């Protein structure tokens, strides 16, 4: 019985040492690098990473990832454009495995353009104030804006990805979807809103106070409009549907 107790105790100590070693190893793998950048107002992402954006006083980038992924991210800033990409020699299966291990934090005083190519993510959790803003997604990635104030905005989606804007205040908006993706916008105010859907995707826009809405659908996709607007002009070709049951037009 005494030998059995000693054996159990020894086994527990060994297991505890292994678990402790694994925990320390996992923590030590993570590394953070931060640096200042020249002024930029456009961001182009062609890497399967998650990019967080905050509008602030300085231009900077911070990368949080694992040691084994250091050097895989290529960042270039020139002509007012910040480009974030992967080293082309890295194999795709490694990139897919690394996607959830990499967080990129970007700060800039201005933002007039965001382009996401592929399966990455772009998240803006704060307010973005700009005269003009163009959002482009080509691929299966995700773009999320919490709050946007601008004069003119263009939202373009080509592919199967998702674009979501929780709060939008603008004078003129252009929303274009070509593919099977989804666009969802909550528009607090807009003077004119132009919508074009070609494909099997879905566009959902809620208007708090819109003046004129021009809507065109070609394909099997669906457009759902809700809220309040003054005028609505709609055209449809294909098996898709333009749902205006929740849209109230001012008299």
PLM features per residue range, with description:
Residues 47, 139, 219:
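Conserved acidic catalytic centers in enzymes
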Residues 2-12, 22-117, 121-136, 147-156, ...:
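Acidic (Asp/Glu) and glycine-rich low-complexity loops/linkers
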Residues 163-251:
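Short, surface-exposed interaction patches in beta-rich subdomains
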